[in-house]
């Protein structure tokens, strides 16, 4: 089935690529795709195209990669050229998903039917850059996707529709990301079909209550603070998979990445950070409240391993201690 609605798409990572694929596969015209410039990645630090760019190129869609869309700052000429290109490209609506660039009012005003954003939280909770990570880290029982009509604020636009999903005890950012990407793809196609049919989408202003912000995840957050409750640390490990991973550093300076852990309510005998039990079922570490059983670990230069395999090639012993990060 083909559609007459013309959609400019702006996005960068896998989350956005799922939406672009759904829009294109549903038969909507996509005259232009915006994505961030290629970035160095991998061990060789070679320039790599974004997942959105790869999809666009594989399907013959035009791609633009401006470093900015703002006429002020480091790239005014590039921004001006990109804005001219947007104006010159016949389209009806713009869809934005994890694009990574700020869209000024000048850009938001170009599409006749506005700009729709696919955001990975139940707004107004977790506005900002890392909503999936922060929802898991906070222990939220559910999260979801919100479609909103974009304005110049940070995820402050009126809400068009939402899809909810429970956060399970086993969910990591990786698993929840994939589920939400599919939910977002389905939701945006439904919205575009409705927009094509009626020429407008009903939208509800976000409530003033319940606003929280999902700050970007930094590598400095990876170190586990064993003075915290075990339940909090278990959520942190899940939230930081696949990036940046939980990190525990032994007193000799050896850093171990932690990829799976289970909180135990029983208080371990030992100061926070002390290994109190080592077995094929897990490495138990004392915490401020309860204890954390580590079940998937990775040594420097190695790969993720179940604890049984990890212990076969690494010596961890009862009484060893992990460092406590400095508190601010």
Swiss-Prot record:
GO cellular component terms given for this protein: cytosol
Residues reported to bind (6S)-5,6,7,8-tetrahydrofolate: 121-124
Ranges in a coiled coil: none
GO molecular function, one term: methionyl-tRNA formyltransferase activity
Name of one Pfam family that matches: Formyl_trans_N
Keyword presence, Protein biosynthesis: yes
Protein biosynthesis in keyword set: yes
Keywords: Protein biosynthesis, Transferase
Enzyme class: transferase
Protein EC: 2.1.2.9
Catalytic activity from the UniProt record: L-methionyl-tRNA(fMet) + (6R)-10-formyltetrahydrofolate = N-formyl-L-methionyl-tRNA(fMet) + (6S)-5,6,7,8-tetrahydrofolate + H(+)
Family membership: Belongs to the Fmt family.
Function: Attaches a formyl group to the free amino group of methionyl-tRNA(fMet). The formyl group appears to play a dual role in the initiator identity of N-formylmethionyl-tRNA by promoting its recognition by IF2 and preventing the misappropriation of this tRNA by the elongation apparatus.
Name of the protein: Methionyl-tRNA formyltransferase
Gene giving rise to this polypeptide: fmt
């Amino acid at each position: 089935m083909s559609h007459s609605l013309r959609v400019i798409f702006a996005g960068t990572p896998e989350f956005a690529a799922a939406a672009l694929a759904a829009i294109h596969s549903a038969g909507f015209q996509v005259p232009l795709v915006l994505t961030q410039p290629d970035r160095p990645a991998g061990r060789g630090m070679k320039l790599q195209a974004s997942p959105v760019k790869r999809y666009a190129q594989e399907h013959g869609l035009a791609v633009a990669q401006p470093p900015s869309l703002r006429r002020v700052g480091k790239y005014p000429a590039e921004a001006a050229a990109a804005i001219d290109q947007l104006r010159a490209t016949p389209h009806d609506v713009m869809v934005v998903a994890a694009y990574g660039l700020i869209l000024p009012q000048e850009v938001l005003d170009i599409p006749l039917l506005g700009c729709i954003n696919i955001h990975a939280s139940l707004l107004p909770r977790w506005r900002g850059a890392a909503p999936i990570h922060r929802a898991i880290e906070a222990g939220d029982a559910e999260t979801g996707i919100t479609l909103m009509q974009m304005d110049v604020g940070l995820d402050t636009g009126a809400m068009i529709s939402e899809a909810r999903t429970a956060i399970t005890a086993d969910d990591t950012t990786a698993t929840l990301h994939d589920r939400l990407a599919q939910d977002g793809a389905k939701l945006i196609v439904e919205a575009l079909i409705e927009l094509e049919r009626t020429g407008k989408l009903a939208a509800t202003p976000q409530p003033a209550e319940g606003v929280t912000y999902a700050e970007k995840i930094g590598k400095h957050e990876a170190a586990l603070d064993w003075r915290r409750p075990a339940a909090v640390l278990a959520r942190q490990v899940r939230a930081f998979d696949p990036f940046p991973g939980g990190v525990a550093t032994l007193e000799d300076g050896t850093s171990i990445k932690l990829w799976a852990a289970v909180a135990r309510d029983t208080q371990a005998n030992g100061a926070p950070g002390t290994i109190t039990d080592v077995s094929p079922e897990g490495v138990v570490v004392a915490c401020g409240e309860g204890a954390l059983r580590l079940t998937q670990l990775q040594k420097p230069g190695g790969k993720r391993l179940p604890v049984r395999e990890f212990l076969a090639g690494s010596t961890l012993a009862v009484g060893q201690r992990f460092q406590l990060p400095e508190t601010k």
